[in-house]
Amino acid sequence: MITGIHHVAIIVSSEKSVDFYKELGFQEILRKVREYDSIVLLDATGIRLELFVDPSHPPRSEKPEQLGLRHLAIKIDNFDELIKKYNCDTPKYDWLGERYVYIPDPDGLLVEIHE
């Protein structure tokens, strides 16, 4: 029986992405440096991201509709403050009636921010 999602692993090209997710509210709880990359484990209220920091990986496709992770969606309590900070477009409403915006991380992965 599944009891939850343990973590989401994302390959990123630099510490800029680590900083981006920290600015969204994630906290670094563990870091491991290996010969070929670094692994940074982030947590926000039990939601964990495992970032593999490696500048040698090819860049992400510009088309999010390809196979694999399309976007990461998170819910925050400072929605209006965040959309001003990132100069976002006017928020939209999803099919559940919730406000959201998309913000690309430094490597182009879309992060869907929900109120």
Task: Pin down the residues of each PLM region.
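N-terminal beta-strand motif that seeds the catalytic metal site of vicinal oxygen chelate
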Residues: M1-V18, R70-L72
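Loop/turn position at the start of each blade in beta-propeller repeats
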Residues: T3, Y36, L67, L96-E98
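Core segments of cupin and vicinal oxygen chelate
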Residues: I10-L49
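Residues at or immediately preceding the N-termini of alpha-helices
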Residues: S14-E15, F79-D80, P106
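A short, acidic/glycine-rich surface segment
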Residues: D37, S56-E62
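Vicinal oxygen chelate
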Residues: V40, N87-E115
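Mid-chain, well-packed structural core segment of small domains
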Residues: E62-Y93
